UniProtKB/Swiss-Prot annotation:
Binding partners and assembly: The RNAP catalytic core consists of 2 alpha, 1 beta, 1 beta' and 1 omega subunit. When a sigma factor is associated with the core the holoenzyme is formed, which can initiate transcription.
Gene Ontology molecular functions: DNA binding; DNA-directed RNA polymerase activity; magnesium ion binding; zinc ion binding
Gene Ontology terms: biological process: DNA-templated transcription
Record EC number: 2.7.7.6
Cofactor binding comment, as recorded: Binds 1 Mg(2+) ion per subunit.
Keywords from the named record: DNA-directed RNA polymerase, Magnesium, Metal-binding, Nucleotidyltransferase, Transcription, Transferase, Zinc
Origin species: Mycobacterium tuberculosis (strain CDC 1551 / Oshkosh)
Annotated protein name in UniProt: DNA-directed RNA polymerase subunit beta'
Gene coding for it: rpoC
Job description of the protein: DNA-dependent RNA polymerase catalyzes the transcription of DNA into RNA using the four ribonucleoside triphosphates as substrates.
Amino-acid positions noted as binding Mg(2+) in the UniProt annotation, renumbered to this chain: 535, 537, 539
Coiled-coil zones: none
Binding site for Zn(2+) 2: 891, 968, 975, 978
Length: 1316
């Protein structure tokens, strides 16, 4: 076998019959498989040992040789080579066909490659191949030309003979008729009888004339066919063909079936054909030129690749190794076999029958029928069901052919090459492990023992607990006590990977240090649930074990959960307190007026109370029960930094140093909360809503090392759980309070609704108006009930606390629970005008329950569809972007894109751009950012983090030019500087990072949250697609529904208002031709936009528009934008439109991810004029390749090619990739492979999928070439330094928990006394 690490590219081509015979180890002659009595393979059959190798290691068929010492000997009795049975997986056989057959892929594919090559229509081709028509393969033009006059004379003689015979017969008949009539007259017969005789005579004469005419026509037909006879001409009429052969057989040859195709290909001159086609393309027009272009693609493919087109007609069929189409005995003595064996059997049977018929000299018609059946059986073997009805097995199931083995999700590519099962893995249910630290997970003992079995066995032998591996294995299986101690030792410092399906983004697999736990469930740290999207209602997770030292290092450094706190999509922390933890911290930091021990100022003879000299004193008071953690107090602090605004006031320029004292007016709970934050973090004196907590963790992630952030969130988690327990937040029926005012509110609105009903019955309102009015009324009612509910609930109500703290839920849910449900929609998405007046607390009536189910059912159906759709979108995105890898540090380009940081309000203040987080943040500055005075605020090449953006805004800079992947000049992949900061690490992206896949995951992962439905925008407006369908529409570059026209030029608008349509004319500023858009439906309303005077209003007559501006509501067609404004604008347009959909759902994704995908959509140019290059006009070429070729041609003094940028949808772009392996594993497998084989494509193995398929390390991350061959030689200093780096454990807050022993800790033993 060849080793994957020793080749750099993989080529695919057409196999000729020669190749097939070369691969083969022998010919399969019989259709037999195995002998059912002895169960041994039949000789010369489909499982023959002589051809494919022995079924038992080192043992021949007849048993003469039975040991490894006879290796390589070929037995003289049975002819079997003595070798390993494994060769039955790789040795191929072949079937010699008695008649050639065409390969169905090349004849039946769309477009038909054979048809294009030979210039035959697929219908005609089918007639020839399946013996329905003859085709002329060659004509001896010269001989025909020389003897034409002689032949013509012969033909004239023959025609004369026919005419003479006709005339003679007519003459005789006429005389007989005269005689008959005369006889009748003599007898005095009636006129009636005479007329009958005359009619009969004339009828007979007419028949004579017709018969002669038919004969003459036939001769004329034969002659004209013969004179015009040309190769590749079809003759469907068998009699005509027979006549031609009889008369003029020596002047031409004709045939039917694949043999004729073979002959045509043999006589085909590829170079001459290519030249003539190129000529047609240069001078032709219209359809002719198009057809020539398409044909040239196929012809040029054969010309350039040096493939022989003979490979499309087969004389031999390869037989794949028997182990790949096995036959196994089932327990009932029956056999189960692969469908391929049935298909091969049919081929062999028909082939053998055909050979016999030919030997017998059977009539041509019988032989042809057998050849047709042979052709059909080979077609079924290659691609069953492609032509005609598929061949079915027992139970009417179509048999799986060779093509079906490659195709689809269950095919070879996606099932076995891109997805494999791995050993050293296990799965189990997950439960929460609140005592774990962020980088730990609890692994059940039994599971760990099984996973680490080989390690434990080796260690047992090392420690002399066992003499050899076999006894060690027995010890492990019997679970002797020593085994557990050894397991503890082996497991220490050995990270494991946890994965939860579906793995939508890279945080779906993270590394943890295992802690052994009792029980059979994996324990998961609560803070990583967000990244895995896990909950504990029965979810399962898989555990994988990294084995090699490199794998462990990567797991520990790159994948450890405490190093993956930030989301790769937005760069914001994912490991945040949620649910209970939020409630706990919210409770802890609430300030309750007049709570126990509150600060009282001095009054009269009372001194001030509630003042404490240190947090410790306050905690002691709280323990004594004289102070509540939520009461306002004054406390002297020395270890907490004052808030920024007070710090300057108290400590001047030198700032606060640890130990400096200051007085804080706050609550004990808030002091305790601040003690969880890193030393030197400014005091936060706020109630901890979830948003505030998020902002703090965000800030920590920007300013502190990851390790500190990890420790802080862990402390917050522990405190959160501790105080959530103490807060007593629970939900009971008693907490769901129905507002007492509800009845009177509803009665009031019922009256209003009745009035509307009456108006409707009187005819004052039509049906739609009534519905609209009722919907308005009940919406108001619902809001008012909600208001009443708010006022009625006390602040300490648990339900309101849960909602207010941001832990979960929202006010609408509370209103549904206790107020009223309100209006619900029907399946069409319209409001049902009867509201649901009950709340869930009171219970719904039967009718209310029923109308409520509509919406619920639609919701469930939507979710299911959305999940599938979103998964498919992710798959296409991954496919289009999988080879975008960071290839170099800096491509040195000067280009970039301009992003807005803020806009100036009329009063001169700056309003920060709301989308700064996803546009400017984490980018590299392209040019120096200079303020009005000319000072450089931030230099070119700086990374824009939050501090830099704040500095730019403070200096009054409103927009900056940043580097972007859209303008990156790296030919394959992107450069680190254009990409900017990696969102997941907060540092500049590393070389080798697979940014394409990260981008695809970041866009695809929130896809499930996007709404499915296409929503209506107000009234009758055209449907505007939203949600997931809109994202797909953009990425597939489809023409949108409700397409809006855009201005082709900058100029003034003339708006003409018809009764159903608008007509818009733009008069260009530069005095060019006017641009007219007419027949624009009124349903698509005019666009509202900002005018030059700064006001926002609808487009109207006389307005001034910029080029590319949208004139109507709806969505612009990206292809139009490309045509009018060019590639840069369409890229920005697509990024903006995709972002609008995600922002509407509150999902934050950085622009750079969308840019990576959009860049891939515009990678190609279509050639308009090929100049002196080799490109074919109309072909799609990679932009980098196009520019390189043009530079080369110009350097040699030739004409460069002209091309036009083209926008491709992601599916099309991934199928147009240079890598045939990647395209074939994506979609349309057979079409891609057919094309690749004809073009003799070579795969350079640059992307990820290709390398996964052939089993190489992927060229990304640590698998990239520059990291692959590194030998490490540490210096003395490095050795010394290596041991001083603090590990996560060292500076973890150990005093509270004591040192981690690594032992399994039963949950009950955990004291929660000290919450930190």
């Amino acid at each position: 076998m060849l080793d994957v690490n020793f080749f750099d590219e993989l080529r695919i081509g057409l196999a000729t019959a020669e190749d097939i015979r070369q691969w083969s180890y022998g010919e399969v002659k019989k259709p037999e498989t195995i002998n059912y009595r002895t169960l041994k393979p039949e000789k010369d059959g489909l499982f023959c040992e002589k051809i494919f190798g022995p079924t038992r290691d080192w043992e021949c068929y007849c048993g003469k040789y039975k040991r490894v010492r006879f290796k390589g000997i070929i037995c003289e009795r049975c002819g079997v080579e003595v070798t390993r049975a494994k060769v039955r997986r790789e040795r191929m056989g072949h079937i010699e066909l008695a008649a050639p057959v065409t390969h169905i892929w090349y004849f039946k594919g769309v477009p038909s490659r054979l048809g294009y090559l030979l210039d035959l229509a697929p219908k005609d081709l089918e007639k020839i191949i399946y013996f329905a028509a003859y085709v002329i393969t060659s004509v001896d033009e010269e001989m025909r030309h020389n003897e034409l006059s002689t032949l013509e004379a012969e033909m004239a003689v023959e025609r004369k003979a026919v005419e003479d015979q006709r005339d003679g017969e007519l003459e005789a008949r006429a005389q007989k008729l005269e005689a008959d009539l005369a006889e009748l007259e003599a007898e005095g017969a009636k006129a009636d009888a005479r007329r009958k005789v005359r009619d009969g005579g004339e009828r007979e004469m007419r028949q004579i004339r017709d018969r002669a005419q038919r004969e003459l026509d036939r001769l004329e037909d034969i002659w004209s066919t013969f004179t015009k006879l040309a190769p590749k001409q079809l003759i469907v009429d068998e009699n005509l063909y027979r006549e031609l052969v009889d008369r003029y057989g020596e002047y031409f040859t004709g045939a039917m079936g694949a043999e004729s195709i073979q002959k045509l290909i043999e006589n085909f001159d590829i170079d001459a054909e290519a030249e003539s086609l190129r000529d047609v393309i240069r001078n032709g027009k219209g359809q002719k030129k198009l057809r020539a272009l398409k044909r040239l693609k196929v012809v040029a493919a054969f010309q350039q690749s040096g493939n022989s087109p003979m490979g499309m007609v087969l004389d031999a069929v390869p037989v794949i190794p028997p182990e790949l189409r096995p036959m196994v005995q089932l327990d009932g003595g029956r056999f189960a076999t692969s469908d391929l064996n049935d298909l091969y059997r049919r081929v062999i049977n028909r082939n053998n029958r055909l050979k016999r018929l030919i030997d017998l000299g059977a009539p041509e018609i019988i032989v042809n029928n057998e050849k047709r059946m042979l052709q059909e059986s080979v077609d079924a073997l290659f691609d069953n069901g492609r032509r005609g009805r598929p061949v079915t097995g027992p139970g009417n199931r179509p048999l799986k052919s060779l093509s079906d083995l490659l195709k689809g999700k269950q095919g070879r590519f996606r099932q076995n090459l891109l997805g494999k099962r791995v050993d050293y893995s296990g799965r189990s249910v997950i439960v929460v492990g609140p005592q774990l630290k962020l980088h730990q997970c609890g692994l059940p003992k039994l599971m760990a023992l099984e996973l680490f079995k080989p390690f434990v066995m080796k260690r047992l032998v090392d420690l002399n607990h066992a003499q050899n591996i076999k006894s060690a294995k027995r010890m492990v299986e019997r679970q002797r006590p020593q085994v557990w101690d050894v397991l503890e030792e082996v497991i220490a410092e050995h990270p494991v990977l946890l994965n939860r399906a579906p793995t939508l983004h890279r945080l779906g697999i993270q590394a943890f240090e295992p802690m052994l736990v009792e029980g059979k469930a994996i324990q998961l740290h609560p803070l990583v649930c967000e990244a895995f999207n896990a909950d504990f209602d029965g979810d399962q997770m898989a555990v994988h074990l990294p084995l090699s030292a490199e794998a462990q290092a990567e797991a520990r450094i790159l994948m450890l959960s405490s190093n993956n706190i930030l989301s790769p999509a937005s760069g914001r922390p994912l490991a945040m307190p949620r649910l209970d933890m939020v409630t706990g911290l919210y409770y802890l930091t609430t300030e309750v007026p007049e709570d126990t021990g509150e600060y009282q100022p001095a009054s009269g003879d009372h001194p001030e109370t509630g003042v404490y000299s240190s947090p410790a004193e306050a905690i002691m008071a709280a323990d004594r029960g004289v102070l509540s953690v939520r009461a306002k107090i004054k406390v002297r602090l020395t270890q907490l930094r004052p808030p920024v605004e007070i710090e300057a006031e108290l400590f001047g320029h030198s700032g606060w140093q640890p130990g400096d004292a200051w007085m804080a007016e706050t609550t004990l709970g808030r002091v305790m909360f601040n003690e969880l934050l890193p030393l030197g973090y400014p005091f936060v004196n706020k109630q901890m809503h979830k948003k505030v907590q998020a902002a703090i963790i965000n800030d920590l992630a920007e300013r502190y090392p990851m390790i500190v952030v990890a420790q802080t969130v862990d402390k917050l988690k522990d405190a959160g759980f501790y105080w959530a327990t103490r807060s007593g937040v629970t939900v009971s029926m008693a907490d769901v309070l129905v507002p007492p005012r509800k009845k009177e509110i509803l009665d009031h609105y019922e009256e209003r609704a009745d009035k509307v009903e009456k108006q409707f019955q009187r005819g004052a309102l039509n049906h739609d108006e009534r519905n609209e009015a009722l919907v308005e009324i009940w919406k108001e009612a619902t809001d008012e009930v909600g208001q009443a509910l708010r006022e009625h609930y006390p602040d300490d109500n648990p339900i309101i606390t849960i909602v207010d703290s941001g832990a979960t839920g929202n006010f609408t849910q509370t209103r549904t629970l206790a107020g009223m449900k309100g209006l619900v929609t029907n399946p069409k998405g319209e409001f049902i005008p009867r509201p649901v007046k009950s709340s869930f607390r009171e219970g719904l009536t039967v009718l209310e329950y029923f109308i409520n189910t509509h919406g619920a059912r639609k919701g469930l159906a939507d979710t299911a569809l959305r999940t599938a759709d979103s998964g498919y979108l992710t798959r296409r995105l991954v496919d289009v972007s999988q080879d975008v890898i960071v290839r170099e540090h800096d491509c040195q380009t000067e280009r970039g894109i301009v992003v807005e940081l803020a806009e100036r309000a009329p009063d001169g203040t700056l309003i920060r751009d709301p989308y700064i987080e996803t546009s400017a943040y984490a980018r590299t500055l392209g040019t120096d950012a200079v303020d009005e005075a000319g000072n450089v605020i931030v230099e070119r090449g700086q990374d824009l983090g939050d501090p830099e953006i704040d500095a730019l805004l403070a200096a009054g800079i409103t927009q900056v030019k940043v580097r972007s992947v859209l303008t990156c000049a790296t030919s394959t992949g992107v450069c680190a500087t254009c990409y900017g900061r990696s969102m997941a690490t907060g540092k500049l992206v590393d070389i080798g990072e697979a940014v394409g896949i990260v981008a695809a995951q970041s866009i695809g992962e929130p896809g499930t949250q996007l709404t499915m439905r296409t929503f209506h925008q107000g009234g009758v407006g055209e449907d505007i697609t939203g949600g997931l369908p809109r994202v797909q529409e953009l990425f597939e570059a489809r023409v949108p529904r409700g397409k809006a026209p855009i201005a082709d030029v900058t100029g003034r608008v003339r708006l003409e208002d018809g009764e159903r349509f608008y007509k818009i004319t733009i008069v260009p500023d530069d005095g060019g031709e006017e641009v007219v858009y007419d027949k624009i439906s009124k349903r698509q309303r005019l666009r509202v936009f900002k005018h030059e005077d700064g006001s926002e209003r609808v487009l109207s007559d006389g307005d001034h528009v910029e080029v590319g501006q949208q004139l109507m509501e709806g969505s612009a067609d990206p292809h139009e934008v490309l045509r009018v404004q060019g590639p840069r604008e369409v890229q920005i347009h697509l990024v903006r439109e995709v972002q609008e959909v995600y922002r509407a759902q509150g999902v934050s994704i950085h622009d750079k991810h969308i840019e990576v995908i959009v860049r891939q959509m515009l990678r190609r140019v279509t050639i308009i004029d090929s100049g002196s290059t080799e490109f074919l006009p109309g072909s799609l070429i990679d932009r980098a390749e196009f520019e390189a070729e043009n530079r080369r041609v110009v350097a040699e003094g030739g004409e460069p090619a002209a091309g036009r940028p083209v926008l491709m949808g992601i599916t099309k772009a991934s199928l147009a990739t240079d890598s045939w392996l990647s395209a074939a594993s994506f979609q349309e497998t057979t079409r891609v492979l057919t094309d690749a084989a004809i073009n003799c494509r070579s795969d350079k193995l640059n992307g990820l999928k290709e390398n996964v398929i052939i089993g190489k390390l992927i060229p990304a991350g640590t698998g990239i070439n520059r990291y692959r061959n590194i030998a490490v030689q540490p210096t003395e200093e490095a050795r010394a330094a290596a041991y001083t780096i603090p590990s996560y454990e060292d500076q973890y807050y150990s005093p509270d928990f004591g040192a981690a022993t690594g032992a399994a800790v039963p949950l009950d033993d955990y004291g929660y006394s000290d919450y930190r």
